[in-house]
């Protein structure tokens, strides 16, 4: 990639921002060496890695990556008989600690492997060494201190040292206390790593010992008393022994590190890369970046692109595309209107994407991969001092023309400026034609009207302009494709106070052709602005309609859910009523089985169950209230009709506080409330009695078989029928029955047997014999 372009577009500023977000020196080193790539697969992988890392940060926050240094040279030094110093061992421990933490950073859910496969694969490649980490942490305290726990021998040596030092101090303190007059100071100090005392020169001869030093004034000599010379010698020997033991420990740990060097090298490289990738992800979050589409067709489409180095709260987004129906874009408009920023935005965003950096554009933007990007952007401060403005630009253009490739992007700022306008415009058109005929993607900014006409008349060339608000005399920085811009020199001058006569005179000097062209531009601009405003209103209206539609859809969904809730609650209530009624029926049936006239009892029980079901159906449709019962007085022995089940009976208990009492209906006693009772006359009682006897007589002969066939039914249907069948069997007194369920898959047999095991009415379950159905049937014995 052209080095001048990288500097002009401030590519290094982007690298610096990413480098600062790296946690480790190795990560920073990768960021510092970053350059744009040209292979699509490499770029796609790098962008996707960054996008995955960004997703993880949003979900799990920043990863636990610590300081990582290059430990390879230190580890390889072990192979030459050396050892690793404590400082580097601590760094190796830090690398391994980071491996441990980052492998647990996101967990190992299927969702992570599906959404972030590349980052998860990198994390999986990390190798943990827990035993080595424990050894390092146990042995190394700091960069220059080894723990007593490193070995038993080291602990013993240091304990002996402490005792020896204490002995020396005791000896010297004894000497100090008995020779106070001879001492310069009553202290113990060190010279040449040996304990000495400061003695006045005048008393030097009164001390037996070795002189190690004297003061700068010559008044003090530092003497090692003979009484401690041997102790000092022993202390020195212990220190030497300590150093040897420390080196032995370091070599032992170093050998263990060397044994797993390949794993540590992988960990170092992967952690460094992860550090760099997550730094790119953090930067992407800062600039609200997205993951663009890529192509090698020379087509790019940036939607609401923002220059990443400008304040994102103030920068005005631009939407720009090139390489589809046109290859050359000519941008015109006033100075400071945003033309140069547009060029730099296009160039820098392209460089970022080709470097695997997510870009500040809206979703579904597309980036073209270029072999090279050439720029001629700058002002007089950036131009070589020895050349004129025009010469400096032209020298740069010559370099571009000589080095251009088919798959290049060229960005010209004020092409043809710095010389005679007529000649400059002609040169600019000729240069643009060179690139146009080679289908090289080119964007150029200019003030020349000739280039506007060139863009209007030449195929595959399009005009563009930066918008200027003449009312506020300020640029809006909005880019418009397809519309040439105006300089607005006359309007700006008038609003700034220039006399109208001067402005009118200037207009007269213009050729009629220039006037007509400017009028056309003004008309186009006005109409374009009106179209844009209409389009914006349509978009707002569409947005309002969409919001309204969404609101109504939500209301409909809410109503639907509420309806379903009401229905479900009603079903639950109905089911509860049914189950309660069924339980009451079962209790009645259990009482009836003790009666002598079993067939009559079954008739009454079935009739009661049917009446209960009838009552349930009625009570779920409307609330039953007996208004007349409130006015009548009921007492013990009264004949009444129970509303809802159409049965008659005799009151056999006094009502409680709630109005509940017992009514004798034939051989049954039924709970009822006075609200649901109606007093009846004697004639009605006689008719009812006859009716009940008639029912019993008609149903007494009903035939209950000793087997039931449940084949072809699902488990729920089979159990429902079986439950009713067992009730009937209990009433008529059958003790052994055969349940035919068939063989099939065995699921029906299994479901029925599970139900029977929980049924208290069943005394015993046994398989049918071979000639009785085998596995396709089950015999049960009832209590």
Curated annotation (Swiss-Prot):
One Gene Ontology MF term: ribosomal large subunit binding
Keyword DNA-binding applies: yes
Protein residues bound to ATP: 333-340
Keyword set includes Lyase: no
Root EC class: hydrolase
Domain Smr positions: 708-783
Biological process according to GO: mismatch repair; negative regulation of DNA recombination; rescue of stalled ribosome
Gene3D superfamilies: 3.30.1370.110, P-loop containing nucleotide triphosphate hydrolases
Keywords on record: ATP-binding, DNA-binding, Endonuclease, Hydrolase, Nuclease, Nucleotide-binding, RNA-binding, rRNA-binding
EC number: 3.1.-.-, 3.6.4.-
Pfam families in UniProt: MSSS, MutS_V, Smr
Assembly and oligomerization: Homodimer. Binds to stalled ribosomes, contacting rRNA.
NCBIfam families: mutS2 (TIGR01069)
Protein family according to the UniProt entry: Belongs to the DNA mismatch repair MutS family. MutS2 subfamily.
Chain's role: Endonuclease that is involved in the suppression of homologous recombination and thus may have a key role in the control of bacterial genetic diversity. Acts as a ribosome collision sensor, splitting the ribosome into its 2 subunits. Detects stalled/collided 70S ribosomes which it binds and splits by an ATP-hydrolysis driven conformational change. Acts upstream of the ribosome quality control system (RQC), a ribosome-associated complex that mediates the extraction of incompletely synthesized nascent chains from stalled ribosomes and their subsequent degradation. Probably generates substrates for RQC.
Name of this chain's protein: Endonuclease MutS2
Taxonomic source organism: Finegoldia magna (strain ATCC 29328 / DSM 20472 / WAL 2508)
Source lineage: Bacteria, Bacillati, Bacillota, Tissierellia, Tissierellales
Primary gene name: mutS2
């Amino acid at each position: 990639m052209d080095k001048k372009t990288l500097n002009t577009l401030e590519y290094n500023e982007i690298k610096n921002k990413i480098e600062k977000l790296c946690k480790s020196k190795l990560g920073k080193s990768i960021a510092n060496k970053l350059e744009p790539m040209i292979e699509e697969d490499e770029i796609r992988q790098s962008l996707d890695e960054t996008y995955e890392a960004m997703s993880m940060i949003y979900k799990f926050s920043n990863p636990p990556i610590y300081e990582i240094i290059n430990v390879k040279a230190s580890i390889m030094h072990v192979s030459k008989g050396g050892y690793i110093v404590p400082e580097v061992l601590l760094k190796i421990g830090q690398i391994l600690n980071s491996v441990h933490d980052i492998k647990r950073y996101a967990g190992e859910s299927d969702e992570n492997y599906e959404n972030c496969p590349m980052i998860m694969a990198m994390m999986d490649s990390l190798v943990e060494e827990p035993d080595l980490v424990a050894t390092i942490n146990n042995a190394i305290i700091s960069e220059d201190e080894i723990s007593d726990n490193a070995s038993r021998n080291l602990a013993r040596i240091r304990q002996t040292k402490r005792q020896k030092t204490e002995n020396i101090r005791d000896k010297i303190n004894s000497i100090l206390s008995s020779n106070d007059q001879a001492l310069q100071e009553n202290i113990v100090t060190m010279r040449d790593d040996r304990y000495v005392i400061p003695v006045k020169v005048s008393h030097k001869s009164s001390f037996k010992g070795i002189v190690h030093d004297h003061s700068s004034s010559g008044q003090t000599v530092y003497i090692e008393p003979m009484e401690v010379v041997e102790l000092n010698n022993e202390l020195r020997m212990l220190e030497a022994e300590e150093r040897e033991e420390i080196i032995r420990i370091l070599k032992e740990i170093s050998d263990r590190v060397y044994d797993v060097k390949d794993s540590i090298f992988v960990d170092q490289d992967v952690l460094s890369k992860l550090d760099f990738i997550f730094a790119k992800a953090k930067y992407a979050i800062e600039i609200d970046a997205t993951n663009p589409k890529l192509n090698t067709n020379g087509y790019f489409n940036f939607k609401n692109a923002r220059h990443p180095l400008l304040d994102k709260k103030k920068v005005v987004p631009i939407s720009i595309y090139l390489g589809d129906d046109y290859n050359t874009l000519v941008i015109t408009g006033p100075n400071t209107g945003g033309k140069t920023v547009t060029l730099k935005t296009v160039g820098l965003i392209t460089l970022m994407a080709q470097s695997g950096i997510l870009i500040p554009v809206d979703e579904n933007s597309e980036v073209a991969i270029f072999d090279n990007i050439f720029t001629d952007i700058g002002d007089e401060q950036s131009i070589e001092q020895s050349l004129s403005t025009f010469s400096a630009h032209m020298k740069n253009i010559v370099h571009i023309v000589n080095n251009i490739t088919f798959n290049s992007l060229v960005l010209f700022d004020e092409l043809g400026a710095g010389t005679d306008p007529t000649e400059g415009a002609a040169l600019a058109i000729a240069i643009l034609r060179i690139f146009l005929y080679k289908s090289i993607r080119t964007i150029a900014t200019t003030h020349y009207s000739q280039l506007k006409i060139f863009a209007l008349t030449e195929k595959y060339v399009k005009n563009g302009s930066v918008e200027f608000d003449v009312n506020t005399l300020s640029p809006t920085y909005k880019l418009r494709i397809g519309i040439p811009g105006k300089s607005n020199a006359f309007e700006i001058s008038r609003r700034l106070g220039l006399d109208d006569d001067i402005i009118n005179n200037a207009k007269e000097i213009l050729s009629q052709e220039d006037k007509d062209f400017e009028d056309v531009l003004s008309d186009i601009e006005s109409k374009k602005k009106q179209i844009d405003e209409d389009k914006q209103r349509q978009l707002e209206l569409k947005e309002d309609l969409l919001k309204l539609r969404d609101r109504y859809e939500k209301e409909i969904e809410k109503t639907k859910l509420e309806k379903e809730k009401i229905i479900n609650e009603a079903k639950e209530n109905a089911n509860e009523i049914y189950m309660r009624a069924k339980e009451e029926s079962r209790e009645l049936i259990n009482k009836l089985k003790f009666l002598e006239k079993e067939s009559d009892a079954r008739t009454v029980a079935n009739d009661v169950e049917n009446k209960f079901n009838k009552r349930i159906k009625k009570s779920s449709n409307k609330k039953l209230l007996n208004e007349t019962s409130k006015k009548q007085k009921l007492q013990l022995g009264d004949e009444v009709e129970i509303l809802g089940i159409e049965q008659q009976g005799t009151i056999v208990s006094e009502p409680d506080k709630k109005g509940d009492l017992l009514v004798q209906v034939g051989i049954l006693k039924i709970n009822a409330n006075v609200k649901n009772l109606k007093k009846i006359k004697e004639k009605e009682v006689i008719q009812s009695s006859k009716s009940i006897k008639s029912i019993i007589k008609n149903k007494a002969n009903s035939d209950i078989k000793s087997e039931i066939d449940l084949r072809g039914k699902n488990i729920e249907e089979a159990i429902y029928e079986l439950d009713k069948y067992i009730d009937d069997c209990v009433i008529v007194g059958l003790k052994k029955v055969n349940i035919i369920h068939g063989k099939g898959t065995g699921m029906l047999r299994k479901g029925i047997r599970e139900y029977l095991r929980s049924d208290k009415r069943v005394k015993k379950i046994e398989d049918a014999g071979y000639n009785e159905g085998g596995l396709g049937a089950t015999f049960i014995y009832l209590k």
